[in-house]
Amino acid sequence: MTVRLKTLYLDTAVPKLQEQFKYKNAHEIPKVTKVSVNRGLGEASQNAKALERSLEELAVITGQRPVVTRAKKAIAGFKIRQGMPVGVMVTLRGERMYAFLDRLVNLALPRIRDFRGVSPKSFDGRGNYTLGLREQLIFPEVDYDSIDQIRGMDISIITTAKTDEEGRALLKVLGMPFREN
């Protein structure tokens, strides 16, 4: 069973991008390679229960068990010692990546209050896109009553696009709702 967004990419995006950018080789056509979901714990780094809740929430949202990221160096100003947990992250590839992107674009983003589209300026210069979410409640998988605190997350969409223009065209064809400036 192929995911809906993957079939959309193969049937619609590939021919559209090939025509738009005049690619001679099929391997030049940009595609999404991975999606990285990251959440910094901040104050909750001392709280083991908050770490557990974050792990559970990201697992429910992404469908994959997150990895705990740990501090590489001690920073006295932030009361962090080396090896302390500072965040959780998930790297999605393949079918899970397409399923997550589909849910993000079609279910989660439209549920944001006063949503007018995502910023078209959040590209990194190499065709990769990053967006930050302020709350986890926009995902339908998260139960409102089960959360202890509203926490956001960063989502990075890594593509094989060479330029921001190619990356923007790819994500637009896949349904990413960019804001018109």
Swiss-Prot record:
Q: Which InterPro entries does this entry report, sorted A to Z?
A: Ribosomal_uL5, Ribosomal_uL5_bac-type, Ribosomal_uL5_C, Ribosomal_uL5_CS, Ribosomal_uL5_dom_sf, Ribosomal_uL5_N
Q: Name one GO cellular component term.
A: ribosome
Coiled coil ranges (UniProt) are: none
Ribosomal protein: is it a keyword of this entry? yes
Extract one GO molecular function annotation from the record.
structural constituent of ribosome
GO BP annotations, alphabetical order: translation
State what this protein does: This is one of the proteins that bind and probably mediate the attachment of the 5S RNA into the large ribosomal subunit, where it forms part of the central protuberance. In the 70S ribosome it contacts protein S13 of the 30S subunit (bridge B1b), connecting the 2 subunits; this bridge is implicated in subunit movement. Contacts the P site tRNA; the 5S rRNA and some of its associated proteins might help stabilize positioning of ribosome-bound tRNAs.
Listed under subunit, the entry gives: Part of the 50S ribosomal subunit; part of the 5S rRNA/L5/L18/L25 subcomplex. Contacts the 5S rRNA and the P site tRNA. Forms a bridge to the 30S subunit in the 70S ribosome.
Its family remark reads: Belongs to the universal ribosomal protein uL5 family.
* UniProt protein name: Large ribosomal subunit protein uL5
Origin species: Acaryochloris marina (strain MBIC 11017)
The gene it comes from is rplE
